[in-house]
């Protein structure tokens, strides 16, 4: 769970500290055939890099191979990018709320793919996904009040 929280939280904290510096959107502003951007301007290379760095450090602190932390972060960010892609295709605004779609892909994908490496059971994976959903639901409004998140979700 700490790997997930570190990978997911790193881009948010990095944005808080760096503001608008080094912001390079992953989709480079490209649009899909529906006229909407592929992912949106909030999905940046800076965010992916910060997730990888923080999750690999967290893995090291947890006694897990840093390479597992790198893969965990990359899979977490891939899940987040897939969710953003789906939200754009559904016509949802950038950074809009979409319960489940906002949390399930980025928690399920790394846990599922790294199940063996992290010695997770299917029950563990289900609990990780559920717990991450609940943390996002209840902690995000607090982080918004503290001006760490830009939205209360």
Regions found by a protein language model. Name each.
Residues 1-66, 70, 77-112, 122-153:
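Interhelical loop and helix-boundary elements at the membrane-water interface
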């Amino acid at each position: 769970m700490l790997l997930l929280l570190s990978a997911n939280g790193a881009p948010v904290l990095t944005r808080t500290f760096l503001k608008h510096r080094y912001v390079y959107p992953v989709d480079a502003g490209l649009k899909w055939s529906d006229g909407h951007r592929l992912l949106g301007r909030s999905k940046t290379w800076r965010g992916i890099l910060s997730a990888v760095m923080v999750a690999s450090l967290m893995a090291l602190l947890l006694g897990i191979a840093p390479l597992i932390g790198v893969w965990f972060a990359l899979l977490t960010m891939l899940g987040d990018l897939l969710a953003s892609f789906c939200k754009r295709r559904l016509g949802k605004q950038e950074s809009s709320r979409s319960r489940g779609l906002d949390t399930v892909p980025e928690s399920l994908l790394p846990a599922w793919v790294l199940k063996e490496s992290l010695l997770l059971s299917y029950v563990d994976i289900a609990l990780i996904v559920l717990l991450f959903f609940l943390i996002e639901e209840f902690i995000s409004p607090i982080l918004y009040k503290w001006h760490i998140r830009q939205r209360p979700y």
